[in-house]
Design a protein with these regions (language model features):
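Charged, amphipathic alpha-helical coiled-coil/dimerization segments
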Residues: 63-114
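Short, charged, low-hydrophobicity "junction" segments
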Residues: 1-5, 40-43
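Acidic/proline-rich low-complexity IDRs
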Residues: 17, 51, 56, 68, ...
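N-terminal helix-turn-helix DNA-binding core of bacterial DNA-binding proteins
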Residues: 13-56, 77-78, 84-86, 93
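Amphipathic alpha-helical dimerization/coiled-coil segments
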Residues: 2-9, 13, 32, 93-128
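Residues within the DNA-recognition helix of helix-turn-helix
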Residues: 60
Length: 128
């Protein structure tokens, strides 16, 4: 008897599109803030919007910049440092792809929850 191999369909609930770089809570907040402000945000404004410390924001921005998702422009204004962060076109595209997958997760979860809810008529029958 010959060994038959079946093609295995991709795992339905693998959600490979949930980009690990974006999925981290702080980085998701950063990208969401930046996508809502296409001209960019100053470091301190972004820090307040995301409720992060200087160090946390710096580290997460570094990860996002290395991945090509954000661009950081540093300059001086009246002898004070000015850092402006913007989402890149690549960052915008990956963020939107991430949202598509996240929306599928929500749809799947809602469908699973709805199918798991007991039918009120059946519950009454069992209780009687």
């Amino acid at each position: 008897m010959a060994n038959e191999t079946k093609k295995v369909a991709p795992a339905r609930f693998a959600y490979d599109g949930l980009d690990r770089i974006i999925h981290e809570k702080a980085r998701l907040g950063i990208l969401t803030s930046l996508i809502a402000h296409p001209k960019g945000l100053r470091f301190n404004d972004l820090k307040q919007l995301c409720a992060l410390t200087d160090g946390n924001l710096s580290r997460h921005l570094e990860v996002l910049e290395e991945a090509g998702l954000v661009a950081i422009a540093k300059s001086f204004e009246k002898n004070r440092p000015k850092t402006v962060c913007k989402i890149t076109p690549v960052g915008r595209k990956r963020y939107m792809q991430y949202l598509d997958v996240l929306e599928q997760v929500v749809r799947d979860a809602a469908a699973a929850a709805a199918s798991a809810e007991p039918n009120p008529a059946q519950t009454k029958l069992r209780l009687a």
